[in-house]
Amino acid sequence: SSVLRGSGLSSSAAFEVLIAAILDGLYNGFVVDAKTRAVIAQKVENVYFGKPCGLMDQMASSVGGMVTIDFKEQDAKVEAIACDFAAKGYALCVVNTGGDHGDLTDDYAAIRKEMEAVAAHFGKHVLREVELETVESHVGELRRACGDRAVLRALHYYDENARVLEQAAAIRG
């Protein structure tokens, strides 16, 4: 992988998926599918490296290219988005800003914990199982039960999901 370490561009996920692919090739003849490689890589990140991440980075790294991922079902729906930026007169540039995300494990753990707390308030495991309108209509009690930051993160989650759908539609269209 040529992804810069600690850059916030899923360098650990890219590395884990690379190792999974190498081992799959050496011992299995490349029979393990991209989703399974991603799940294996996530397990490595969670257990071996002690980083409480979700599956998004590993799935995107394993499938490759530009993708949308819907984690609503247990078996994540992954869809490639074909886009030739150059043909449309654009270039996708990655810039090394010198930032380092290497020591943010506790911060990432807090995000997941707080979002799960909001979901648990409604008897669910993840926010994907809770409608935005439900969260919006219970903001007061959520603030008291989970805190302001958890509520803001939950609202940001819904905004991000809507933005991704809009961007995917724009790229396809």
Language-model features: where?
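Gly/Ser-rich oxyanion-binding loop with an adjacent helix/lid
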Residues: S1-F85
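C-terminal nucleotide
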Residues: T68-G173
